[in-house]
Design a protein with these regions (language model features):
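Catalytic P-loop NTPase motifs of RecA-like helicase/translocase cores
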Residues: 111, 301-308, 351
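Peripheral, non-AAA+ core regions of ATP-driven protein-machinery
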Residues: 1-214, 221-224, 262, 327, ...
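Short beta-strand elements
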Residues: 18-24, 279, 383-390
Length: 512
């Protein structure tokens, strides 16, 4: 006797289809699971047997063999409890059921209740891609998965309810979403930032082209305040991006109960003591790190020079590629990491190096050591470098007169329009923002006109720029032109873009 139940297993933040085959045959009573199951799945017998008995059913006296197909791929997760238990019950009761169009996920407690699971949305997505139209999930996970279209999400609270769904599918009622998916309102607005018009302009350019940006300035000048307001000017998440982000947070076990669908772009600000695994992801059972949790949003690295060197170096490739590739137990796991990196740092240990009103107490050796940390390979990959000064007295006076400059709503309008232009230009390409272009695409789309190229050539020689910096200036100039609605990149756009690499030369000189 044999039953087959459809389910799925996670591989990173994605799933792949799994068929649970359950067989009863004569022999010594026993329970065996084959198919590269992890410890959690192998322990399933100790949950399934009491759950079946405490639900009023009898556990078979025959030998039970469970095969997880495909047998050659590693599998993990307690959500296999439900399909295994249902397969055993169908064989014990002698029932025949049509389960080809249904996938099952759920962890069993000893009394037969079905507990919530991690990764419900990516598992349900996998089932939908496999052609399944009915997905049975724990009740607590249904709000998360109900965002999916073209499938029926069927909630179950206990094993008895689940077996009824299998025996008599006509009686099941699909889950109806309770909450309307809307973007969470942000109380942070750029109009609250006094002065710093240069910094706000730089952040708007960075947001428009998805460029990384490094802000340097003394303590209290507003670096963190401005960084925390960046999500308020980024475009709203699309439906596909919401699914992608919700899946990442679901796998990480960080999906808020009151917000089962991620509707706002994430802002992650890890402490500088974070480990390499915490930053890029990993572990014995790989989980997304801060880079992936900030996917499609902002990763803010405050006090960049204080982060562990190994952790920062490990970010170089993922930040450029937009994904993290890990290898565990002969298995390749990929986590997404398309983030806007925003870093902040003081120019020296005391923070007063560039302050005209305060005296720097650092020695030349301390300044050089600090600057070397900020001019390494990772910082070189950040497109824009911005010097943030202390707020001037005249800016305070303008604030009193309610001359607050642009609001986040006004800045977002410009950013959204610039992103729209880029999306049309790069239609059919892997990335849709200027910040992600490679050299060949930069040559095709981002070279300035003749006068602009001459200015850029002169700057390249006088400023001692690297070729990487040269290409980054072209990308920034392209974004500035998009913000201004210009098709051609001219001298004004190149001149403004050059401002965002001037600080690099000063940093290298101080670090020499």
């Amino acid at each position: 006797m044999l039953t087959r139940m459809k389910t799925a297993s996670l591989q990173g933040v994605n799933g792949y289809p799994v068929t649970v085959e359950t067989d009863l045959h004569r022999g010594m009573p026993g329970f065996q699971i084959v198919g590269l199951a992890d410890t959690t799945i192998k322990e399933a017998f100790n949950r399934i047997r009491p759950a079946i008995i405490n639900s009023g059913y009898s556990f078979p006296r025959e030998k039970v063999t469970v095969n997880l197909s495909p047998a050659g791929k590693p599998k993990e997760g307690s959500h296999f409890d439900l399909p295994i238990a249902l397969g055993i019950l169908l064989l014990t009761l002698g029932e025949e059921a049509q389960t080809e169009d249904t996938a099952f996920f759920g962890e069993l407690s000893l009394d037969g209740r079905i507990n919530p699971i991690r990764g419900a949305l990516p598992l349900a997505l996998c089932a939908r891609k496999a052609g399944v139209h009915n997905i049975v999930l724990p009740l607590q996970n249904c709000e998360e998965a109900a965002v999916l279209e073209d499938v029926n999400i069927i909630p179950v609270s206990d094993l008895t309810q689940a077996i009824c769904c299998v025996k008599d599918p006509q009686t099941t009622v699909p889950y109806k979403k309770k909450k309307r998916v809307e973007e969470a309102h942000s109380d942070l607005d750029f109009s609250e930032v006094i002065g710093q018009e240069y910094g706000k302009r730089a952040l708007m350019i960075a947001a428009a082209g998805d460029h990384g940006i490094l802000m340097m300035g003394g303590p209290g000048c507003g670096k963190t305040m401005m960084a925390r307001r960046i999500p308020s000017i980024l475009p709203r998440l699309s439906y596909e991006e919401q699914l992608e982000l919700t899946g990442i947070y679901s796998v990480a076990g960080m999906l808020p109960e009151d917000e089962p669908v991620i509707t706002s772009r994430p802002f992650r600000s890890p402490h500088h003591s974070i480990s390499m695994a915490g930053l890029i992801g990993g572990g014995q059972k790989p989980r997304p790190g801060e880079l992936s949790l900030a996917h499609r949003g902002v990763l803010f690295l405050d006090e960049l020079g204080e982060f562990e060197g190994r952790a920062i170096d490990a970010m170089r490739q993922p930040v450029e590629d937009g994904f993290i590739r890990l290898n565990r137990n002969l298995e390749e796991i990929i986590f997404p990491s398309e983030v806007m990196v925003v870093a902040a740092a003081n120019p020296c240990k005391c923070g007063n190096l560039w302050d005209e009103k305060k005296t720097c107490t650092c020695s030349s050796a301390q300044i050089s050591s600090h600057m070397r940390k900020l001019t390494g390979p990772f910082a070189d990959r950040i497109d824009m470098h911005v010097r943030v000064a202390q707020v001037a007295g005249k800016d305070l006076k303008e604030q009193e007169q309610e001359n607050k400059g642009m609001t986040s709503a006004q800045m977002r309008e410009k950013v959204v329009e610039a992103r729209r232009i880029q999306e049309e230009r790069y239609r059919g390409m892997p990335h849709r923002e200027n910040g992600w272009l490679g050299e060949s695409d930069i040559i095709r789309y981002c070279l300035p006109d003749q006068d602009g190229q001459e200015l850029l050539r002169q700057a390249y020689e006088k400023m001692g720029l690297t070729m990487r910096a040269y290409w980054k200036i072209c990308k920034i100039a392209r974004t500035i032109a998009d913000l201004e609605g210009k098709e051609t990149i001219g001298t004004p756009e190149v001149a403004e873009a050059l401002q965002f690499r001037i600080m690099e030369k000063e940093m290298r000189r101080n670090g020499a």
